[in-house]
């Protein structure tokens, strides 16, 4: 590890292979916590490259719980966190809208790290059992169409690093790579990131991971979601080509909404917001979800255009299909799925 720390101190980038090996060292129980903290802080200070991100993702996916590869067509819509905006759980609420529209959603998430309420906190409050094994997750994806992958359970080797991240209390490379370490073999992905200068590197990593189609967004105000506040910077990965673009919500019929207007709270408050959206209540929360879910449906290839994606998202909610997916997940995740273990 000393060699890698020395390179980072000197401001040198690590190669993909060096980062892969450093990642394996970070997960080794014999490494000192001070070394882990130093590595994360030095890497953040230098700035992460696509090669470094992919190298670490390789190491983490290699050490994650094993999944079968028979699940086809799965998608994740996960933000990196780290934007400090304290918004409600936009991507988690949107996940049920995607599932209601017929997308198979493998939602990878965690408890709150830099926010008040993480996806795991919200889902627990709603009644979802977040403690699912890989076999149970496969079952839920096949029979319910949506499953939650609790990141600490999927990546047991990360327990020490999670503790150190909490103590550091600053965004690190792990905020960037969370959405990229989903152990399910995804075909498509919608990723929100808080760092605009990382749009292209993250898209390049998704390309290396073999995604058929993906959208990476940095929202107005540097939100890690698509924002109704103003222009959103986006990178589209399609047909193995990467295209940079900007998206204005007003073009799609949305009124401007400041990011402060969609702040969330604790898990109970955010659960109320999510249930309101999925029940069809008109609000700025609904519009934000429609925008994000519409973009995700476009990223998935479920629709040919963003406009069609937004319309399909609205249908998923207003038909009751999105809320039905939540209720199905609550019921199925709490069953003893002994038949699949």
Swiss-Prot record:
Keywords (A to Z) from UniProt: Amino-acid biosynthesis, Aromatic amino acid biosynthesis, Glycosyltransferase, Magnesium, Metal-binding, Transferase, Tryptophan biosynthesis
Catalytic activity: N-(5-phospho-beta-D-ribosyl)anthranilate + diphosphate = 5-phospho-alpha-D-ribose 1-diphosphate + anthranilate
Residues that bind anthranilate 2: 165
Chain residues that bind Mg(2+) 1: 91, 225
Residues that bind 5-phospho-alpha-D-ribose 1-diphosphate: 79, 82-83, 87, 89-92, 107-115, 119
One GO MF term attached to the UniProt entry: magnesium ion binding
Pfam family, one: Glycos_transf_3
Enzyme class, spelled out: transferase
Cofactor annotation: Mg(2+)
EC number: 2.4.2.18
One of the GO biological process terms: L-tryptophan biosynthetic process
Protein name per the record: Anthranilate phosphoribosyltransferase
Species per Swiss-Prot/TrEMBL record: Bacillus cereus (strain ATCC 10987 / NRS 248)
């Amino acid at each position: 590890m000393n060699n890698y720390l020395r390179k980072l101190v000197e401001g040198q980038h690590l190669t993909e292979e060096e980062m892969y090996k450093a990642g394996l060292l970070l997960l080794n129980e014999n490494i000192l916590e001070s070394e882990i903290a130093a590595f994360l802080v030095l890497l953040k200070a230098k700035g992460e490259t696509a090669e470094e991100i992919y190298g670490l993702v390789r190491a983490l996916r290699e050490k994650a719980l094993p999944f079968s590869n028979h699940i086809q067509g799965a998608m994740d819509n996960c933000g990196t966190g780290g934007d400090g905006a304290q918004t409600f759980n936009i991507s988690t609420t949107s996940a049920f809208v995607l599932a209601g529209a017929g997308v198979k959603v493998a939602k990878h998430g965690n408890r709150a790290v830099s926010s008040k309420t993480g996806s795991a906190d919200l889902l627990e409050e709603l009644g979802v059992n977040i403690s699912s094994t890989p076999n149970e997750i496969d079952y839920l994806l096949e029979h319910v169409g949506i499953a939650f992958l609790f990141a600490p359970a999927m990546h047991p080797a990360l327990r020490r690093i999670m503790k150190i991240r909490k103590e550091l209390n600053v965004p690190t490379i792990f905020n960037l790579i969370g959405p990229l370490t989903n152990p399910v073999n995804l075909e498509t992905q919608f990723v929100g990131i808080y760092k605009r200068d990382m749009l292209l590197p993250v898209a390049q990593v998704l390309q290396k991971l073999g995604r058929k189609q993906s959208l990476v967004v940095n929202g107005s105000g540097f939100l890690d979601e698509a924002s109704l506040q103003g222009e959103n910077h986006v990178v589209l990965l399609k047909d193995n080509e990467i295209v940079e673009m900007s998206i204005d919500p007003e073009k799609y019929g949305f009124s401007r909404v400041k990011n402060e207007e969609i702040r969330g709270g604790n898990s109970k408050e955010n659960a109320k917001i999510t249930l309101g959206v999925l029940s069809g209540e008109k609000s700025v929360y609904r519009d934000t979800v429609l925008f994000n879910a519409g973009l995700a449906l476009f990223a998935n290839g479920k629709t040919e255009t963003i406009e069609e994606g937004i319309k399909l998202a609205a249908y998923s909610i207003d038909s009751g299909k999105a809320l039905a997916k939540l209720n199905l997940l609550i019921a199925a995740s709490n069953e003893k799925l002994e038949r699949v273990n």
